[in-house]
Amino acid sequence: MASSTPSSSATSSNAGADPNTTNLRPTTYDTWCGVAHGCTRKLGLKICGFLQRTNSLEEKSRLVSAFKERQSSKNLLSCENSDRDARFRRTETDFSNLFARDLLPAKNGEEQTVQFLLEVVDILLNYVRKTFDRSTKVLDFHHPHQLLEGMEGFNLELSDHPESLEQILVDCRDTLKYGVRTGHPRFFNQLSTGLDIIGLAGEWLTSTANTNMFTYEIAPVFVLMEQITLKKMREIIGWSSKDGDGIFSPGGAISNMYSIMAARYKYFPEVKTKGMAAVPKLVLFTSEQSHYSIKKAGAALGFGTDNVILIKCNERGKIIPADFEAKILEAKQKGYVPFYVNATAGTTVYGAFDPIQEIADICEKYNLWLHVDAAWGGGLLMSRKHRHKLNGIERANSVTWNPHKMMGVLLQCSAILIKEKGILQGCNQMCAGYLFQPDKQYDVSYDTGDKAIQCGRHVDIFKFWLMWKAKGTVGFESQINKCLELAEYLYAKIKNREEFEMVFNGEPEHTNVCFWYIPQSLRGVPDSPQRREKLHKVAPKIKALMMESGTTMVGYQPQGDKANFFRMVISNPAATQSDIDFLIEEIERLGQDL
């Protein structure tokens, strides 16, 4: 059997070579390289792919070098259709005399369009490079009045007359300059962080397609991608692959609202036509540390926030099941009808996971709809090491899952998943005749728009689908495990240091690490209202200095009667242990004299 290792004498003799391998001489593949550049992009790429597949590793390297040299010498950014000689050549362009009206679809606007977009791409690539450069600031902070007054030619006011493309390019640069680099490895301020390059490419393509998700008619590929991805997510939860439903929504708050609407419609379908007057006095339940969107939905859907009953939590922020059952009985005694509970898998502040199994038992006992808000913690379902923290989620009637959080998908990307098929459609369908005709030439069950409370719906699926294709489930698992390891690293570094005090004892369940920084003036001081009052001011002062310096960002907040503390969250796969070390050192540097 011939060796798969390329022969060093292949250029002079083919003796002993694998008959299934074609080793082209450098002059031959260089010639074909030139042919590829003279063809249409599609055919040229096929020729290039063939040449790379059929050559040895050394010759592949030469081939790549030949392509680079050829493109560099011609200053080309891509191969295009030679029939029109439409190659993307970078040329010096005076944008000060060009306006939006000079771009496509204007007559003869193709060259100006190409040059303008190449400038925009250059701005974007420069921003991407700086985002991953740790010597670059996370933000260049300015107060609102400074930005409103104008910064070095950057004016937010709108004018009646068009401005030149040169000014538009300046505006593009400055918009990024004065924003926050949420993809920076040292940005820890929110649950949604990172800048995934595959996701970025997907978002660019999504904007270029500029379509709507309401019908298969105008978004055939995207609609199918959404259905396939939602099905996969339901399977990961543990539901049957044959049943179930779901839709992507503008965010976790809207996904949670969908769950309440679906539950209400399931138990009281007449509410759709007759309103709240046709149903009994309904109450719903959620933990006192759940996301505020549950109360907001209660207000928006006509229940009233007083009828969103808060369940007590233990010191780690988890629902106390006994209190949940007691509040159900109390509500029933008062003449209310309990119908829904929200359990949280990964609370916003503590990162706590409610005991879903015990809550599900109570829901079955009293016939309540169980929703799991896994907006923050849903990503852990991708991890074989950590998915046990969501045990029982397969018993839920609905689940919120935000890939734009722990999975690093670019904003926005949130899914509401329903165990029973047909409820979303029945709850929200209005049969708008101009969109949802039943006599179309294709299977209209793929027209998903009537399941949504929106009409127009942004394409959120493509970047997520593309990332999943690029990473695989194991890729998501790896980056999620890494983020949780970094949280464990931070906890281990600060738990026994006198400069820091943990908000609660024990290792974090999620990547949330909650702690106080204790300045020198408060170390060793016994707990008292005066000490808590002083401690309450520490985190805001450090955060203000942090933003002024622009070196890093981390959030803070109070919780119950606790003084302001830092809430560290990690969801950016670009972060490393050195970034955690930097954060600790920066907090100490900024807070040492407080």
Curated annotation (Swiss-Prot):
User: What's one GO MF term for it?
Assistant: identical protein binding
Question: Might you give the EC number(s) for this enzyme?
Answer: 4.1.1.15
**GO BP terms in the entry:** gamma-aminobutyric acid biosynthetic process; glutamate catabolic process; locomotory exploration behavior; social behavior
Which regions are flagged for Low complexity bias? Answer: 1-13
The coenzyme or cofactor needed here is: pyridoxal 5'-phosphate
| Modified positions (N6-(pyridoxal phosphate)lysine) in chain numbering | 405
Q: Which reaction does it catalyse?
A: L-glutamate + H(+) = 4-aminobutanoate + CO2
Keywords, A to Z? Decarboxylase, Lyase, Neurotransmitter biosynthesis, Phosphoprotein, Pyridoxal phosphate
Record-stated family:
Belongs to the group II decarboxylase family.
Briefly, what is this protein's role?
Answer: Catalyzes the synthesis of the inhibitory neurotransmitter gamma-aminobutyric acid (GABA) with pyridoxal 5'-phosphate as cofactor.
Q: What is the designated name of this protein? A: Glutamate decarboxylase 1
Source organism: Pan troglodytes (Chimpanzee)
